[in-house]
Amino acid sequence: MPDLPGSSPERDAWMFQQSIHNSLLQFDDVKIYPTAICQSSDSNLIITSTIAEWYKEGSYKPYSEVDLSLLMNVLKEYKTNIQPWVRIQRLVRDIPSKSIEAGYQKYSNLRQMLHDEMKKEGKVCQCIRCMEIDDLGDNNISPTLVVRSYPASYGTEYFISYEWYPTFSWLFSLYLYFFYWSGDNSRKAIIGFCRLRIDKNPGGGFINELKNCGLIRELHVYGSSLQIGKNGSSSQHKGYGQKLMIVAEDIMKSYGLKKSAVIAGVGTREYYKNKCGYYLEGTYMVKELKQSYMYIWVILIFVILLI
């Protein structure tokens, strides 16, 4: 929430940098709400706002009211450098401009203004919302498997995704398949992703079904859904979800983990059961992991060829 009383463009820029680089602040989603001073909707003034009182007294004035570009520059810097595993859910509260007394000069379409400026400057936001693909349809494209890992809250997170790039060679594809290259931020569109967490004490160490487990926290494939039993070309029905799950399970095996656990809602349990081989244990969908030593042979063959 930038532009709060006592803050400044420099402090807000530091705050956003912390959210990018601090391992304790690696959230999945974020809502950015620049400070807005709103009129009270209560005629008896039972609902009061200290910030509104400070504004009327003259002891506080949002810096965006003095110069909107100060706030815009802070937001552009964050959107340009945001980690690709974060999704900006909202930017600016959905408040009618007539209800705003002060703050970002009452522009309720600030997000659109921000994107227009970034487009003119040749800047691109790397967040999931700005990169997610609507639907592949029948387009004949070959998405790239990208695996990113990062420390988060005393554990390791993996952001596994299928992304579309303009060029892609078969040799590079082979390298990706066996070694899970980490990729870069030059992607064009994200088709789907899986969030995997590796933790020394999954579930805090007191949930029996999570012992020695890797945790799949989220699986999401973009595109339109179809009725059960119907065929179609939607990206949700091209098997990307299953492929992402296989990669996540391979990573768990490399840590020597025995089980995979999915935080799955009631409506998605059948998918994990029928498509991925999971079963219900407690409140989690779990799967026993069978160790495969094929990757050792691949590495040995690769070394022999190099020699």
Annotate each PLM feature.
Residues 44, 52-65, 234:
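Glycine-rich tight-turn/loop motif centered on a GG-T
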Residues 232-252:
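Conserved acetyl-CoA-binding loop-helix of GNAT-fold acetyltransferases
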Residues 293-307:
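Terminal signal-anchor or tail-anchor transmembrane helices
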Residues 86-214, 220-222, 226-228, 255, ...:
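Non-catalytic substrate-recognition and accessory regions of acyl/acetyltransferase enzymes
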Residues 264-284:
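Conserved active-site alpha-helix within GNAT-family acetyltransferase domains
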Residues 250-264:
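Conserved GNAT acetyl-CoA-binding A-motif
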Residues 286-292:
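Short beta-strand-to-coil "C-cap" segments at the C-terminal boundary of structured domains/repeats
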Residues 1-53, 69-97, 215-216:
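Conserved C-terminal portion of the radical SAM core fold
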